[in-house]
A protein has these predicted regions:
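Extended, Lys/Arg-enriched charged tracts that mediate electrostatic binding to polyanionic substrates
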Residues: 72-74
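Nucleic-acid endonuclease domains
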Residues: 1-62, 67, 77-165
Length: 165
């Protein structure tokens, strides 16, 4: 977060302004998605000291491909207002390994998890569908790393935890 805030542009008249200060939410979501996906690739490859994962940019079946395993990982990201449910979207409703990340617009709070998400957890729509968080809470193959999924008064609540030191 701090690195992005440090990037500035010069406006007419020489005035300096934050480069990401007035960016649309969906564009910021795309930037978060790319940084997150590439970071997972880099960490896995560094840890294994060889290229295990690739992050193709050609609308491949998966966001992260493990060619030697003929498999992949789908990453889903969302920029989510505090107190709201994240909206993870997809064009394909596949069962498989997913890594989810939701971050608040100011970057201070995060929800993250990973695991196998069944295809029936997706609400189909055109042109994109959304992950049904109400079904996700009952999926035993999904693990929350940061934040929590809880049922309160019959409703599923997604809690984002602070990531500030």
């Amino acid at each position: 977060r701090g690195q992005m805030e440090a990037i500035t542009i010069n406006k007419p008249g020489g005035q300096s302004s934050p480069a990401f200060g007035e960016i649309q939410k969906n564009i910021m979501g795309g930037i978060v998605h790319e940084i997150f996906t590439n970071s997972i690739r880099d960490i896995v490859n560094y840890t294994k000291e060889k290229d295990i994962l690739k992050a193709p940019k050609n609308n491949a079946l998966y966001d992260l491909e493990a060619e030697m395993e003929n498999s992949g990982i789908e990453t889903k990201t969302a920029v989510t207002e505090t107190g709201k449910k994240p909206k993870f979207v997809g064009h394909r409703y596949k069962e498989g390994y997913h890594v989810l990340l939701s971050i608040t617009p100011n970057g201070n709070r995060v929800f993250a998890g990973y695991g196998i998400i069944p295809a029936d957890c997706w609400k189909k729509g055109m042109p994109v569908g959304t992950l049904n968080i109400d079904k996700l809470i009952d999926v035993s193959t999904f693990n929350v790393l940061i934040g929590s999924l809880e049922k309160e008064n019959g409703k599923v609540v997604v809690n984002h935890d602070s990531v500030l030191a």
